[in-house]
Amino acid sequence: MAEHLMSDVPFWQSKTLDEMSDAEWESLCDGCGQCCLHKLMDEDTDEIYFTNVACRQLNIKTCQCRNYERRFEFEPDCIKLTRENLPTFEWLPMTCAYRLLAEGKGLPAWHPLLTGSKAAMHGERISVRHIAVKESEVIDWQDHILNKPDWAQ
């Protein structure tokens, strides 16, 4: 009987991030697109500034990469989040499943693994579809910084 109960526990509750298969790891991504917004770094302080400028490969409406399998070929600066480098990505959003699970927390109620679709995530405005702009339409990237430093307010 105990074995049957174990199989009813979702993998993200029964495994550590290190124990997950590649498919399980990939499925944790809610597809919000926040990783696909460009970031700028202050050369003097190394502070990271978030913009609403979407990577050229991001389909803003669906918040999915147009060329996910070949993304590093098209975008050499694309981020590859792995089990090994996860601790170095302090900038991940507070809603990110990778971050939440690494911190011993659960998935949010709107997460696609719980709801079966991205609709709830989009409804909660977690995804970037309502703020992202196309890279090709941007003239001055600094005009698109979301977390401006005090001196630029």
From Swiss-Prot:
This is UPF0260 protein YcgN. It holds the Pfam family CxxCxxCC. Belongs to the UPF0260 family.
